[in-house]
Amino acid sequence: MPLDNVRNIVLVLSGKGGVGKSSITTQLALTLSLQGHTVGVLDIDLTGPSIPRFFGIEESKVRQAPGGWIPVDVHAQQTLSAHRLQKTAEGQEIGALSCMSLGFILPNRSDAVIWRGPKKTAMVRQFLTDVLWPKVDYLLIDTPPGTSDEHISLLETLLKNTSTTPHASLPYLAGAVVVTTPQAISISDVKKELNFCKKTGIRVLGVVENMAGFVCPNCSECTNVFSKGGGEVMARDFNVPFLGSVPIDPAFVQLVEEGTRPLYPEGTIMAGTDVSAAPNGKEAGSTTHGSRLLICE
């Protein structure tokens, strides 16, 4: 089975649409790659596949091989020079990154996917069984909102072919990252997703509160546009880890609109601390545009 080449599987879930699951998936994938891990991204949001846009590879097409589909390469394994990283070390290994999405298969990007449940279920199963992943350390699965046919088919197939504990011969279903926005209307829907994980036995790795404020492009001040702290309170109520808050950053949007992969550029800040001094070059999937990842206080 193609998943035999996968070491760890992480789901990115949310009970609410439009909270930024795909942007979180993209940043997780690029960050893991920057740390030297080989990463795959599977986009099973069939009616709104946006992962190709986030990676700037919308025009790419999957190739068919005798055993199944070959995922699209985002970038190959490479070494960034110490000069580019502004470090004294010899360099940094960037892990290979590849992805699979229905967006690569549709004849036109604007084509609507009007499928009933059985066809969606079959497509999800095909993505899990017919994609020829290379050896990857992490497979991130970007899911649609809610707890629909796609989720049920996804978990049925994964639970048959993976292990929920580290196992030498089976892919490890590590768990799920749950994404929300801070306002109450989003929290109420995302709570259903946490209950879904509990009922299906999927470990929740943590909650990310996205769009938790607005970063001013002039002064970098973060203003809480909606409410504040809803994701953290929800995580505490469900006794799961809270991974942090991510505000709206116009620089992030600009990178995506330009077709540039938003990979922790120089100036990335987490809770006021610089967490990446690297102006990652084009071969790493980014440019030296200043962009910030902030925690709103």
Swiss-Prot record:
InterPro entries from the UniProt entry: Mrp-like_CS, Mrp/NBP35_ATP-bd, NUBP2/Cfd1_eukaryotes, P-loop_NTPase, YlxH/NBP35
Main location: cytoplasm
UniProt-listed GO biological process terms: iron-sulfur cluster assembly
GO cellular component, one term: cytosol
Residues involved in ATP binding: G15, K16, G17, G18, V19, G20, K21, S22
Keywords in alphabetical order: 4Fe-4S, ATP-binding, Cytoplasm, Iron, Iron-sulfur, Metal-binding, Nucleotide-binding
Cofactor(s), names only, from the UniProt record: [4Fe-4S] cluster
Cross-referenced HAMAP family: Mrp_NBP35, NUBP2
Subunit structure: Heterotetramer of 2 NBP35 and 2 CFD1 chains.
Protein name per its UniProtKB record: Cytosolic Fe-S cluster assembly factor CFD1
Gene name linked to the record: CFD1
